[in-house]
C-alpha cells in the first residue's frame, strides 16, 4: 500500500543566534509585517491623501503598543487565565510565546479610539478605515510565522498537501507513527488574509472607499478576516485542553466564539456604510 505523499515540514524556527539569544523567523516575519510592510503601505496612503505626517508617526506608536499589549492580554484572559493568575510575572514574558489575534484586534481598536481623540480629532471609523487596509498583510505574515514555528496547525488529513510537522511535539503526540499529515491551517489563513488585504487595497485605491463610505473598509476587513478564521477553526486542533469541553457544550471552540462579534460588527458596518455614503465634496 502506497501512502499519500505528505509534505514533511522540518523547518528550523531559529534564523541565527546573536550573543547567545536565538533570533527566530516568527519574530522576523512579525516585524516585517508590523514594522516594515504595514507602515510603508500606510505612509503611501498618508501621502496620497496629503495628511499630516505627524499623524502618521503618532499612529505607528499607538498601533504598535495596542497590538502587542492587546494580543498578549488576549492570550492571558481568553486562553489561560488560571495559569497567569497563579504566575502573574509570566504575563510579561512575551518571548516565550502567547499572542491572541482577537486580543490584538481589540487592542488596536482601543488604541485607534485614543488616537482619534488625542491626535486627529476625527472619528474612529476614519482612522480604522485607513488602518485596516495594510493590516491583512500583517496578519498573513504572523500566520507564516506560526508555520515556521510548526504551531497552530490543523487536524490530521489524508489530503496530499497535509504537512508532517515533525519538529512539533504536539504533532508527534497526535500522529504517533507520523504516517499522516495535518492541515496546514497557517497557510490557509495566510492566503485568506492576503485576499482580504487585496480587497481592502482595491476598495481604497480604486473605489476611494475611505472617503466615500465611512466604515466600509474596516467592515470588509473584520468580516473577511474573522469569517475565514471562524471557518478554518473547524479543522484546527484545540490550543488548550479545556477547549474540548467547550466544543462538547456549545459546538464551537474559543477562536470561533471570539470571532462571531467581529463578523457581526463587520456586517453591520458594511450595511451602514452602503446605506449612508458620504455626500460632501471630496478634495
Swiss-Prot record:
Cite the InterPro entries for this sequence: Lgt
**Which pathway?**
Protein modification; lipoprotein biosynthesis (diacylglyceryl transfer)
Q: Name one GO molecular function term.
A: phosphatidylglycerol-prolipoprotein diacylglyceryl transferase activity
Principal subcellular localization: membrane
Task: Print the keywords alphabetically.
Answer: Cell inner membrane, Cell membrane, Membrane, Transferase, Transmembrane, Transmembrane helix
How does the protein's chain sit in the membrane according to the entry?
Multi-pass membrane protein
Q: Which residues bind a 1,2-diacyl-sn-glycero-3-phospho-(1'-sn-glycerol)?
A: 143
Any stretches that span the bilayer, and where are they?
A: 18-38, 59-79, 91-111, 124-144, 185-205, 213-233, 251-271
What is one GO cellular-component annotation here? Answer: plasma membrane
Q: Where in the cell is it found?
A: Cell inner membrane
EC code(s) of this entry: 2.5.1.145
Would you kindly state one Gene Ontology biological process term found in this protein's UniProt entry? Answer: lipoprotein biosynthetic process
Cited function: Catalyzes the transfer of the diacylglyceryl group from phosphatidylglycerol to the sulfhydryl group of the N-terminal cysteine of a prolipoprotein, the first step in the formation of mature lipoproteins.
Q: Name the family.
A: Belongs to the Lgt family.
Q: What's the protein called, per UniProt?
A: Phosphatidylglycerol--prolipoprotein diacylglyceryl transferase
| Protein source organism | Porphyromonas gingivalis (strain ATCC BAA-308 / W83)
Q: Specify the taxonomic lineage.
A: Bacteria, Pseudomonadati, Bacteroidota, Bacteroidia, Bacteroidales
